[in-house]
């Protein structure tokens, strides 16, 4: 039996559709109806249909259902059924209105899907149609009308109706898919393999993908793609992906879908796998496309492309020589050229007024060199995309410290300023102890070159008690010139700069080096641009320079000792999207991302050879997290609570355990990192220092000692400012700044909504500026026990904070064992986000 639909087409009769509609009318009155009664009414409707062949329409069927309900005395249900019919009619009308307005019939299915998935009255498409109509103009093209429809959904997003952002994302994805289909048809692309061939021929894809996989393997991998996962994105995330990460043609048209991007990255990251490679492609694709893990911005942007620089950040130790300083500047320029940020340690460079080759008082000091760093950051602007990003670190005992602390402030001599770099200070325990005890005590500043000349050692090469003994030895040595200041004056300079500019960043060097699992191979002088990396460092040195003849030509050959030029390979677990209580699943997902990061080391395009050498010696990775506040909110856990501290203590211990176990299994499969022997991993000291003495931990320590570790360093919590937007979650381990706000981007106001915002989570999402910062610091201290590197910890202050209160936060961070502090964010201060480390 065929039924005539409203649009004139026919479909086969399905009695279950009538039964479902009848049951819905009873649900709304909270009455029960037996299946027998339901099908009695259905039978009556069917009897009518058999008797009236010429009038078998949807509308006539619904009339008969109403009549039958009333005949059986179900008057309230009949009324609800009539209301249901009216609502369906109104939904069809608004659907038709939007379709007519866009001039695109193909959007109907998306709109019906939206009506089904967002059934609340506040998400009625009537609101969308009204807003859309107000934007439409007669001379608009079809593309402009679709853009206006997306804009209408975006503007309907509020903290009371946050899901409009997901509706906007679906409409944006429809628009993107439509463009991609047009591009594919024009280019003769009919399969994923066709697309990779086209992108490779156009120089938009690295040829290594097609060289590594057969056409059959690529088509098999194409079957892994799940377009349904596009629905996981909110508008902000999808818009950011579309504008900055998806591959575009030379004419700037999109040529890659979101799922194709994730599969392309997965294909690239799985290339080093010798066995079950497609299985790893699928695992990598799944954790990325489900938004459970985000790779660092450079990996997300550059994997699968010809210039596949996948690392976020680098750290260089600037030596105290003209050649060395300019080499470091060159290193920075090359890193910046390929989209990386850098941390530079200037603690070895002689201070202003120091001696050069016996000439007294002629050294210009570190500020002059930092101005060159500043100009390099501005000049090498990453193909016009954004200027370079660099943090410069100086020890708190360096003679040039007072001027250094005023690099970015607005007062003082502009010739001594460098507004485009990010200063950071390295503190020993002694400084904080003295600051806590008595701010009026004297602190003494030295020139590192003078200490080396007079004392025969570099003070910065020591930490802890040995550093303190040598520092006091320098203080008491009359041969050394000292610049003495009260700790109060130094602290005042630090805090004023922090409140005014958000910097200097803080690096607690004794805390860092005591916990260094690879102290047998060196020392950690400083961190990176975002303060989450803590790895062994040493200067690059020229050993010799020779003039040689090669193929009849005269060439100059330099022999260079590569030092330890740190590389940051980052990814983040999206805690808000992960089953944190499911230990088995968490172990599997952590193991998958650890393997992916280890493969980054093999696959990376290195801007300078020193980075490649260090990366292969240590094989360091930085697995971090995002969605920290998100994870707390969906579980109803308040930030300012002991429950928060206890819960995250367990979570980070599990993550650490899973990461160590995964790295050890990789070592068994592929070999341990070069310097494993003698490390705290090998001796077991790593586990003893952290009090990991349960049977499970002890068994893991034995396994690590026997099997080795694939990676010298494992965990580091980056800020994730960009990639957390993509994943639709909260940034890093920060509390949200606001539950809802509008952000201006290129003349448009974009809504930013706290993830999973609802009546249940609204009060859990307390603003960072209203949150007691001592809870954030205590939480960071608890996490730090389980993190072998560091974390990007921001402090949020209001205009009511006194300098003493800010100092107390720094002291508490040091006392809690926090290794680094990133920005001090004042409500009146705009600070630049680091996109390089936005993993």
Identify the residue ranges that each predicted region occupies.
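Core nucleic-acid recognition elements
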Residues: 9, 31, 36-263, 267, ...
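Alpha-helix capping and helix-loop boundary segments enriched in small/acidic/polar residues
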Residues: 9-13, 33-36, 101-102, 140, ...
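Terminal amphipathic helices with adjacent charged low-complexity linkers/tails
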Residues: 80-87, 164-196, 427, 512-535, ...
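Short acidic, glycine/serine/threonine-rich loops at helix termini
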Residues: 160-161, 327, 348-349, 354-361, ...
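Conserved, charged catalytic cores of large soluble enzymes
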Residues: 181-272, 358-372, 384-388, 393-528, ...
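Catalytic alpha/beta core of large soluble enzyme barrels
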Residues: 214-220, 230-239, 531-535, 597, ...
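Function-dense linear segments that define catalytic or interfacial modules
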Residues: 247, 253, 260, 265-277, ...
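Internal maturation/activation junctions in enzymes
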Residues: 287, 305, 329, 589-612, ...
